[in-house]
Amino acid sequence: MAGHSKWANIQHRKGRQDKLRAKLFSKLSKEITVAAKMGDPDPDKNPRLRLAVKEAKSQSVPKDVIERAIKKSLGGEGENYDEIRYEGYGPGGVAVIVEAMTDNRNRTASTVRSTFSKNGGNLGETGSVSFMFERKGQVSYPAEAGDADTVMMAAIEAGAEDVESDESGHIIWCADTDLNEVSTALEAELGESESTKLVWRPTTTTELDLEGMQKLMKLLDALEDDDDVQNVTANFEASDEVMAQL
Protein backbone atom coordinates (compact mmCIF):
# COMPACT_ATOMS: atom_id res chain seq x y z
CA MET A 1 0.00 0.00 0.00
CA ALA A 2 1.29 3.44 -0.85
CA GLY A 3 2.70 4.94 2.26
CA HIS A 4 1.92 2.19 4.71
CA SER A 5 4.57 -0.45 3.95
CA LYS A 6 7.21 2.25 3.60
CA TRP A 7 6.15 3.68 6.94
CA ALA A 8 6.61 0.29 8.61
CA ASN A 9 10.15 0.15 7.22
CA ILE A 10 10.93 3.63 8.54
CA GLN A 11 9.68 2.73 12.00
CA HIS A 12 11.91 -0.34 11.96
CA ARG A 13 14.97 1.66 10.97
CA LYS A 14 14.26 4.23 13.65
CA GLY A 15 14.78 1.59 16.31
CA ARG A 16 11.30 1.87 17.79
CA GLN A 17 10.73 -1.90 17.54
CA ASP A 18 10.53 -2.77 21.25
CA LYS A 19 8.20 0.08 22.14
CA LEU A 20 6.09 -0.59 19.07
CA ARG A 21 5.96 -4.33 19.81
CA ALA A 22 4.52 -3.78 23.29
CA LYS A 23 1.93 -1.40 21.87
CA LEU A 24 1.20 -3.78 18.98
CA PHE A 25 0.49 -6.67 21.38
CA SER A 26 -1.88 -4.43 23.33
CA LYS A 27 -3.69 -3.25 20.18
CA LEU A 28 -4.02 -6.77 18.78
CA SER A 29 -5.33 -8.05 22.14
CA LYS A 30 -7.92 -5.28 22.21
CA GLU A 31 -9.10 -6.19 18.69
CA ILE A 32 -9.44 -9.86 19.74
CA THR A 33 -11.48 -8.94 22.82
CA VAL A 34 -13.79 -6.63 20.85
CA ALA A 35 -14.23 -9.15 18.02
CA ALA A 36 -15.05 -11.95 20.48
CA LYS A 37 -17.47 -9.75 22.42
CA MET A 38 -19.31 -8.68 19.24
CA GLY A 39 -19.71 -12.23 17.94
CA ASP A 40 -18.95 -15.83 18.87
CA PRO A 41 -15.86 -16.47 21.06
CA ASP A 42 -15.01 -19.39 18.76
CA PRO A 43 -12.75 -18.12 15.91
CA ASP A 44 -14.12 -20.82 13.57
CA LYS A 45 -17.61 -19.29 13.91
CA ASN A 46 -16.53 -15.64 13.95
CA PRO A 47 -14.69 -14.37 10.82
CA ARG A 48 -13.56 -11.12 12.43
CA LEU A 49 -12.17 -12.96 15.47
CA ARG A 50 -10.48 -15.52 13.23
CA LEU A 51 -8.68 -12.73 11.35
CA ALA A 52 -7.75 -10.99 14.61
CA VAL A 53 -6.26 -14.19 16.05
CA LYS A 54 -4.48 -14.94 12.79
CA GLU A 55 -2.92 -11.47 12.68
CA ALA A 56 -1.88 -11.75 16.34
CA LYS A 57 -0.20 -15.11 15.69
CA SER A 58 1.60 -13.72 12.64
CA GLN A 59 3.00 -10.95 14.87
CA SER A 60 4.22 -13.55 17.41
CA VAL A 61 1.70 -12.69 20.12
CA PRO A 62 1.97 -15.53 22.71
CA LYS A 63 -0.85 -18.07 22.78
CA ASP A 64 -1.72 -17.33 26.42
CA VAL A 65 -2.11 -13.61 25.62
CA ILE A 66 -4.53 -14.48 22.80
CA GLU A 67 -6.52 -16.83 25.05
CA ARG A 68 -6.68 -14.22 27.81
CA ALA A 69 -7.98 -11.64 25.34
CA ILE A 70 -10.79 -14.00 24.27
CA LYS A 71 -11.67 -14.88 27.88
CA LYS A 72 -11.86 -11.18 28.69
CA SER A 73 -14.84 -10.91 26.35
CA LEU A 74 -16.81 -13.56 28.23
CA GLY A 75 -19.08 -12.81 31.17
CA GLY A 76 -19.03 -9.08 30.57
CA GLU A 77 -15.42 -8.76 31.71
CA GLY A 78 -13.36 -5.92 30.32
CA GLU A 79 -14.26 -2.46 29.08
CA ASN A 80 -16.76 -1.68 26.36
CA TYR A 81 -15.01 -0.08 23.41
CA ASP A 82 -16.44 2.12 20.70
CA GLU A 83 -14.83 1.94 17.27
CA ILE A 84 -14.27 5.40 15.78
CA ARG A 85 -12.62 6.65 12.61
CA TYR A 86 -10.99 10.07 12.49
CA GLU A 87 -9.90 11.76 9.27
CA GLY A 88 -7.66 14.73 8.65
CA TYR A 89 -4.68 16.20 6.86
CA GLY A 90 -1.04 16.08 7.89
CA PRO A 91 1.91 18.24 6.81
CA GLY A 92 2.13 18.66 3.04
CA GLY A 93 -1.58 17.98 2.59
CA VAL A 94 -1.21 14.23 3.17
CA ALA A 95 -4.53 12.51 3.93
CA VAL A 96 -4.55 10.58 7.22
CA ILE A 97 -7.08 8.04 8.53
CA VAL A 98 -6.95 7.14 12.23
CA GLU A 99 -8.86 4.11 13.53
CA ALA A 100 -9.44 4.01 17.27
CA MET A 101 -11.07 1.81 19.90
CA THR A 102 -11.95 3.75 23.00
CA ASP A 103 -13.89 3.56 26.26
CA ASN A 104 -14.02 7.37 26.35
CA ARG A 105 -14.92 9.12 23.09
CA ASN A 106 -14.31 12.63 24.45
CA ARG A 107 -10.80 11.80 25.64
CA THR A 108 -9.80 10.18 22.37
CA ALA A 109 -11.27 12.92 20.17
CA SER A 110 -9.50 15.58 22.22
CA THR A 111 -6.15 13.75 22.11
CA VAL A 112 -6.32 13.02 18.37
CA ARG A 113 -7.31 16.62 17.57
CA SER A 114 -4.48 17.95 19.73
CA THR A 115 -1.96 15.57 18.13
CA PHE A 116 -2.90 16.76 14.65
CA SER A 117 -2.66 20.43 15.69
CA LYS A 118 0.70 20.08 17.46
CA ASN A 119 2.26 18.33 14.47
CA GLY A 120 1.30 20.56 11.56
CA GLY A 121 -1.97 18.87 10.66
CA ASN A 122 -5.66 19.40 11.19
CA LEU A 123 -8.49 17.04 12.05
CA GLY A 124 -11.40 17.10 9.60
CA GLU A 125 -14.93 15.74 9.49
CA THR A 126 -15.70 12.07 8.87
CA GLY A 127 -15.55 11.59 5.11
CA SER A 128 -13.13 14.47 4.55
CA VAL A 129 -10.33 12.20 3.28
CA SER A 130 -11.70 8.62 3.13
CA PHE A 131 -12.83 9.19 -0.48
CA MET A 132 -9.10 9.03 -1.36
CA PHE A 133 -8.88 5.44 -0.06
CA GLU A 134 -10.56 2.10 -0.68
CA ARG A 135 -11.31 -0.43 2.05
CA LYS A 136 -9.50 -3.62 1.02
CA GLY A 137 -8.35 -6.96 2.31
CA GLN A 138 -4.56 -7.36 2.34
CA VAL A 139 -2.66 -10.65 2.62
CA SER A 140 1.16 -10.55 2.78
CA TYR A 141 3.56 -13.39 1.99
CA PRO A 142 7.37 -13.55 2.14
CA ALA A 143 9.32 -13.87 -1.12
CA GLU A 144 10.06 -17.53 -0.36
CA ALA A 145 6.34 -18.39 -0.59
CA GLY A 146 6.88 -18.66 -4.35
CA ASP A 147 7.80 -16.73 -7.46
CA ALA A 148 5.53 -13.98 -8.81
CA ASP A 149 3.75 -16.30 -11.27
CA THR A 150 3.06 -18.96 -8.63
CA VAL A 151 1.62 -16.40 -6.21
CA MET A 152 -0.38 -14.71 -8.98
CA MET A 153 -1.98 -18.02 -9.99
CA ALA A 154 -2.83 -18.86 -6.38
CA ALA A 155 -4.29 -15.38 -5.89
CA ILE A 156 -6.47 -15.63 -9.02
CA GLU A 157 -7.72 -19.06 -7.93
CA ALA A 158 -8.49 -17.67 -4.46
CA GLY A 159 -10.56 -14.81 -5.87
CA ALA A 160 -8.12 -11.97 -5.20
CA GLU A 161 -8.18 -8.71 -7.18
CA ASP A 162 -4.52 -7.72 -7.44
CA VAL A 163 -0.98 -8.82 -6.54
CA GLU A 164 2.15 -6.74 -5.97
CA SER A 165 5.40 -8.74 -5.97
CA ASP A 166 8.99 -7.59 -5.48
CA GLU A 167 12.19 -8.91 -3.90
CA SER A 168 10.81 -8.32 -0.39
CA GLY A 169 7.65 -10.38 -0.86
CA HIS A 170 4.09 -10.43 -2.14
CA ILE A 171 1.06 -8.33 -1.22
CA ILE A 172 -2.29 -9.75 -2.34
CA TRP A 173 -5.36 -7.52 -2.46
CA CYS A 174 -9.02 -8.50 -2.37
CA ALA A 175 -12.45 -7.02 -1.66
CA ASP A 176 -12.87 -6.30 2.04
CA THR A 177 -15.85 -8.67 2.24
CA ASP A 178 -13.83 -11.52 0.67
CA LEU A 179 -10.79 -11.42 3.00
CA ASN A 180 -11.72 -14.43 5.13
CA GLU A 181 -12.48 -16.60 2.10
CA VAL A 182 -9.46 -15.45 0.05
CA SER A 183 -6.97 -15.82 2.91
CA THR A 184 -8.21 -19.35 3.66
CA ALA A 185 -7.84 -20.36 0.00
CA LEU A 186 -4.35 -18.82 -0.17
CA GLU A 187 -3.26 -20.72 2.94
CA ALA A 188 -4.17 -24.00 1.26
CA GLU A 189 -1.85 -23.16 -1.66
CA LEU A 190 0.93 -21.00 -0.16
CA GLY A 191 0.90 -21.84 3.54
CA GLU A 192 0.65 -19.43 6.47
CA SER A 193 0.66 -15.73 5.56
CA GLU A 194 2.82 -13.10 7.23
CA SER A 195 -0.17 -10.83 7.71
CA THR A 196 -3.90 -10.84 6.94
CA LYS A 197 -5.92 -7.71 7.62
CA LEU A 198 -8.35 -5.07 6.45
CA VAL A 199 -6.64 -1.84 5.40
CA TRP A 200 -7.30 1.51 3.75
CA ARG A 201 -5.58 1.48 0.34
CA PRO A 202 -4.89 4.94 -1.12
CA THR A 203 -6.30 5.60 -4.59
CA THR A 204 -4.28 8.82 -4.87
CA THR A 205 -1.00 9.81 -3.20
CA THR A 206 0.88 12.97 -2.24
CA GLU A 207 4.62 13.18 -2.98
CA LEU A 208 6.79 14.54 -0.17
CA ASP A 209 10.41 15.70 0.00
CA LEU A 210 12.70 14.93 2.95
CA GLU A 211 11.54 17.84 5.09
CA GLY A 212 7.90 16.98 4.42
CA MET A 213 8.47 13.32 5.32
CA GLN A 214 10.23 14.24 8.57
CA LYS A 215 7.31 16.44 9.60
CA LEU A 216 4.76 13.78 8.61
CA MET A 217 6.60 11.06 10.54
CA LYS A 218 6.36 13.13 13.73
CA LEU A 219 2.58 13.24 13.34
CA LEU A 220 2.20 9.56 12.43
CA ASP A 221 4.45 8.42 15.29
CA ALA A 222 2.57 10.61 17.79
CA LEU A 223 -0.79 9.21 16.64
CA GLU A 224 0.51 5.63 16.82
CA ASP A 225 1.72 6.23 20.37
CA ASP A 226 -1.85 6.91 21.54
CA ASP A 227 -3.12 3.79 23.34
CA ASP A 228 -6.64 4.34 21.96
CA VAL A 229 -5.40 4.31 18.35
CA GLN A 230 -5.43 0.96 16.55
CA ASN A 231 -4.28 1.90 13.03
CA VAL A 232 -3.00 4.94 11.18
CA THR A 233 -2.91 5.13 7.37
CA ALA A 234 -1.52 7.97 5.24
CA ASN A 235 -1.41 8.45 1.47
CA PHE A 236 2.15 9.77 1.21
CA GLU A 237 4.66 8.86 -1.49
CA ALA A 238 8.41 9.52 -1.37
CA SER A 239 11.44 8.69 -3.50
CA ASP A 240 13.90 5.96 -2.47
CA GLU A 241 16.50 8.68 -1.89
CA VAL A 242 14.25 10.46 0.60
CA MET A 243 13.31 7.20 2.34
CA ALA A 244 16.98 6.28 2.74
CA GLN A 245 17.65 9.51 4.65
CA LEU A 246 14.91 9.05 7.24
UniProtKB/Swiss-Prot annotation:
It is found in: Cytoplasm. It comes from Dinoroseobacter shibae (strain DSM 16493 / NCIMB 14021 / DFL 12). GO terms for molecular function: DNA binding. Pfam families: TACO1_YebC_N, Transcrip_reg. Keywords: Cytoplasm, DNA-binding, Transcription, Transcription regulation. Gene3D superfamilies: 1.10.10.200, 3.30.70.980. InterPro entries: Integrase-like_N, TACO1_YebC-like_2nd/3rd_dom, TACO1_YebC_N, Transcrip_reg_TACO1-like, Transcrip_reg_TACO1-like_dom3, YebC-like. GO terms for cellular component: cytosol. The keyword Transcription applies. Signal peptide: none annotated. This is Probable transcriptional regulatory protein Dshi_2762. Belongs to the TACO1 family. The keyword Cytoplasm applies. NCBIfam families: PRK00110.1, PRK12378.1, YebC/PmpR family DNA-binding transcriptional regulator. GO terms for biological process: regulation of DNA-templated transcription.
